[in-house]
Amino acid sequence: MLRTIARIDFLSIAEQFARRVKSELDADADVYLFGSFARNDANEHSDIDVAVVSRTFGKDISEDYGKLAVLAHHVNPNIEAHPIVFDDWINTTPFTNEIKKDGVLL
């Protein structure tokens, strides 16, 4: 992690990222905070894991990661953004199960 994030700041950072995703990429995307911050067991080395579920993802997953990485970097370099193809969200994978279990919809 590039810097320590105060416990109060992480939700605000994730919400700011969600607003940018919805305004710049996909207004209908669902954005979830997941991982250690969502489970409330983050430490000074934790990044902010955010999943973006969108029907626009899937044609080129590398491009999807790239778009999210650019947005994430502009909001906070500690954000680790993960594009989720809508079909994977519906059909459920081990990764999406983790997000559904512990994730917080922003």
Task: Describe the residue ranges of each PLM region.
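Short hydrophobic/aromatic beta-strand micro-patches
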Residues: 51-53
